[in-house]
């Protein structure tokens, strides 16, 4: 089982401090040195945790009222990481298809995959927070319908097809990705989903090469994953896909202090051996990649986790 780290690219992410983009890239180097086999970047512009997370049934305390958080732009970081690293897998966890025209996004993805030498996993999602969509002028109505149409454009373009599309939200006319990246079929597509409805489950079965189970906001122990996988597996069978063809990627919260920032969540905690055992429980369930949201996300924490990563 491979391990990964979600890089702390957002405001106040490192014990209340915000890393510059250059400092974040240097931190990525330290993560690779510690033994992480993959690096991940989320895709947000701006959110107001007290308001936005409430829509996800996560209630921050009153002192968070009015506080806003942003993030360095995802694909700028991905391009820099692709040029800076040599061996590790790079992925988005996940990129919001509503933020960029899907044909343009496919062109960006293909370019970054080529820069990386074919090490990219492209995680795609429909978007989470109304605040950032409205702030930056994007519609947030009918996000699943938009997401499905975006997938119907991104996937064939990444696979090398020429595409003419006249849809409800997007249009292309003879679009193709030229020149094409080092992988003729493009990078694997991963769709992130924990508690999706029937439509999102169908999209995982129909479009995804990998599925990500995002647990840092919930219970990061393996029982949560098992319940979610049962839903995804059943959806694959319902829509005529062998579940064994869907690679599995899980993101967990790992807390090395008493200050995990997400209210109500249950991250992995404990000694080195307790963390190793909790992670290996995922390997026993067939998970290929276990990525982590680490608190505090510091160089000292990377040193603490190095023996855990070596054991996995």
Model-flagged regions — what are they?
Residues 1-312:
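Active-site-adjacent structural elements that line small-molecule/cofactor binding pockets in enzymes
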């Amino acid at each position: 089982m491979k391990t990964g780290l979600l890089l702390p690219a957002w405001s106040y992410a490192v014990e209340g401090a915000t890393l510059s983009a250059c400092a974040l890239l240097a931190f990525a180097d330290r993560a690779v040195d510690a033994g992480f086999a993959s690096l991940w970047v989320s895709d947000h512009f701006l959110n107001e945790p007290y308001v936005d997370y409430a829509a996800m049934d996560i209630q921050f305390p009153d002192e968070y009222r009015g506080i806003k958080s942003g993030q360095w732009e995802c694909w700028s970081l991905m391009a820099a990481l692709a040029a800076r690293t040599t061996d590790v897998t790079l992925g988005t966890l996940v990129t919001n298809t509503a933020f960029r025209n899907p044909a343009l996004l496919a062109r960006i993805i293909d370019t970054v995959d080529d820069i990386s030498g074919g090490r990219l996993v492209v995680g795609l999602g429909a978007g989470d927070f109304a605040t950032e969509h409205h702030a930056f002028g994007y519609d947030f109505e009918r996000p699943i319908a938009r997401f499905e149409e975006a997938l119907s454009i991104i996937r064939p373009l990444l696979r090398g097809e020429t595409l003419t599309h006249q849809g409800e939200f997007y249009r292309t006319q003879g679009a193709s990705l030229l020149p094409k990246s080092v992988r003729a079929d493009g990078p694997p597509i991963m769709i992130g989903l924990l508690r999706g409805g029937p439509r999102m489950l169908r999209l995982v079965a129909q479009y995804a090469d990998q599925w990500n189970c995002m647990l840092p906001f919930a219970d990061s122990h393996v029982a949560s994953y098992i319940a979610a996988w049962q839903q995804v597996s059943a959806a694959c069978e319902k829509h005529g896909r062998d579940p064994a063809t869907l690679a599995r990627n899980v993101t967990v919260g790992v807390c090395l202090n008493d200050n995990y920032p997400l209210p109500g969540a249950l991250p992995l905690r404990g000694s080195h051996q307790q963390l190793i055992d909790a992670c290996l429980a995922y390997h026993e369930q067939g998970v290929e990649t276990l990525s982590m949201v680490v608190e505090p996300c510091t160089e000292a924490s990377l040193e603490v986790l190095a023996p855990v990563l070596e054991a996995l």
